[in-house]
């Protein structure tokens, strides 16, 4: 099948198997070209198929030489429908890990469920005994509670009052004003249930009870703070409330892990292009301006560069450089005052006439397409490709 990008709103409904493999290969090569990290050896990544979760798995495997188990919920390909990008990413990762002689197995299913938690515990016991690192990097729009059965849906909305701001449609490159109505109390509650810390805590409880955590285990979850311009819709909005809950959960997990010397951290990561962030008005314009400034200053990072820096310079360097709230700050380059001042200036100036020139909207658009395996110069998109790809180590 010849695969081209197809869209439904902000969602790209197709993905390219060869392009996704090429993307993973680039990330693997980046890590293999860095100095080795004396770090984790047996790693569980919950949410391992895209973005920061995938980059964490690649860094652990190819940077630390770790055995990895990845949990994700992805769609395989069929005769006439491509798989989701995360499926192709995971297939490529497993293939490359195997070639390198690294242990890699994956479980495809709902990480929020008790069933997948148990399946993961069984696999750890069978193959690894215990794990010394657990990365929690789930990005899901909904969650079925494993105890009550309630289905929660997350929303990206401001709280208390409507928010009006500039945004840019990266398909048309048109700047416009958008207004987002505030969330109801129930929408806030549901967003916290999906994107807060409860499931992370449930995972760590289950893993500890099953005795599959090594002494001095480390667990990480990822968050974002960002600048003032995004706060109404992000940090002070519904997602921010969920992230507050996630950060509070780290304290609870620390208590729980104390008996085995374990530690839980939240890492505040930088803004990158993800399927999730593309759906947030305001973020696309902010990230386009941020890319422009950080690339000019030669401090731009994607997921993989950032995860290597986190593992090498923070987690296993002996100095986590925690902030006053006990968080790891990987947004340090993004939040430099000189970067933010320039980004704010570009933000204020951006309009339909100049957005292509003063921001990196083109770079943002290309990054978005690359999430699905498109727009890589070295991939032949006119070639007929097999869209049914197996993941070798699926358990």
UniProtKB/Swiss-Prot annotation:
Gene3D superfamilies given for it?
Answer: NAD(P)-binding Rossmann-like Domain
Superkingdom assignment: Bacteria
An annotated Gene Ontology molecular function? trans-2-enoyl-CoA reductase (NADH) activity
* Keywords, comma-separated and alphabetical: Fatty acid biosynthesis, Fatty acid metabolism, Lipid biosynthesis, Lipid metabolism, NAD, Oxidoreductase
**For substrate, which residues are the binding ones?**
224
Question: One Pfam family from the UniProt entry?
Answer: Eno-Rase_FAD_bd
The active site annotation covers 234 (proton donor)
Please state the Enzyme Commission number of this protein. 1.3.1.44
Q: Report the catalytic activity.
A: a 2,3-saturated acyl-CoA + NAD(+) = a (2E)-enoyl-CoA + NADH + H(+)
Q: Where is this site: Plays an important role in discriminating NADH against NADPH?
A: 74
Which pathway does this polypeptide act in?
A: Lipid metabolism; fatty acid biosynthesis
Q: Which residues bind NAD(+)?
A: 47-52, 73-74, 110-111, 138-139, 243, 272-274
**What are the GO BP annotations of this UniProt entry?**
fatty acid biosynthetic process
Q: How does it assemble?
A: Monomer.
What is the role of this chain? Involved in the fatty acid synthesis (FAS II). Catalyzes the reduction of a carbon-carbon double bond in an enoyl moiety that is covalently linked to a coenzyme A (CoA).
Task: List the PANTHER family hit by this protein, alphabetically.
Answer: ENOYL-[ACYL-CARRIER-PROTEIN] REDUCTASE [NADH] (PTHR37480:SF1)
Protein family per UniProt: Belongs to the TER reductase family.
Q: What is this protein called?
A: Trans-2-enoyl-CoA reductase [NADH]
Which species is this record about? Ruminiclostridium cellulolyticum (strain ATCC 35319 / DSM 5812 / JCM 6584 / H10)
């Amino acid at each position: 099948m010849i695969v081209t990008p197809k869209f439904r709103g902000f969602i790209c409904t197709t993905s390219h198997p060869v392009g996704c493999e090429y993307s993973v290969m680039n990330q693997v090569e980046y890590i293999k070209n860095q100095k080795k990290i004396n770090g984790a050896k047996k790693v569980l990544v919950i949410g391992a198929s895209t973005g920061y979760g995938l980059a964490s798995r690649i860094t652990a495997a190819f940077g630390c030489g770790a055995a990895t188990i990845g949990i994700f919920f992805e769609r395989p390909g069929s005769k006439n429908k491509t798989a989701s990008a995360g499926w192709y990413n995971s297939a490529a990762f497993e293939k490359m890990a195997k070639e390198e002689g690294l242990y890699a197995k994956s479980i495809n299913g709902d990480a929020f469920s008790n069933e997948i938690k148990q399946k993961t515990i069984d696999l750890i016991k069978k193959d690894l005994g215990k794990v010394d690192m657990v990365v929690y990097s789930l990005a899901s729009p909904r969650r079925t509670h494993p105890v009550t059965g309630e289905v929660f849906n997350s929303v990206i909305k401001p709280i208390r009052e409507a928010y009006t701001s500039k945004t840019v449609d990266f398909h048309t490159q048109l700047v416009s004003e958008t207004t987002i109505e505030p969330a109801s109390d129930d929408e806030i509650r549901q967003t916290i249930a999906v994107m807060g810390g409860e499931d992370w805590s449930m995972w760590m409880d289950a893993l500890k009870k099953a005795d599959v955590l090594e002494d001095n285990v480390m667990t990480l979850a990822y968050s974002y703070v960002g600048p003032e311009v995004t706060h109404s819709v992000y940090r002070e909005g519904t997602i921010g409330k969920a992230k507050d809950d996630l950060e509070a959960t780290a304290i609870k997990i620390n208590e729980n892990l104390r008996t085995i010397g374990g530690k839980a951290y939240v890492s505040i990561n930088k803004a990158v292009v993800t399927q999730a962030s593309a759906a947030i008005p305001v973020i696309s314009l902010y990230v386009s301006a941020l890319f422009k400034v950080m690339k000019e200053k030669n401090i731009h990072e994607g997921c993989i560069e950032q995860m290597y820096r986190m593992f090498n310079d923070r987690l296993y360097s002996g100095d986590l450089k925690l902030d006053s709230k006990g968080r790891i700050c990987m947004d340090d380059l993004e939040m430099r005052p000189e970067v933010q001042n320039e980004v704010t200036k570009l933000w204020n100036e951006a309009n339909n006439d100049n957005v292509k020139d003063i921001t990196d909207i083109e770079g943002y658009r290309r990054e978005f397409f690359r999430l699905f395996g498109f727009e890589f110069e070295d991939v032949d998109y006119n070639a007929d490709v097999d869209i049914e790809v197996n993941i070798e180590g699926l358990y």
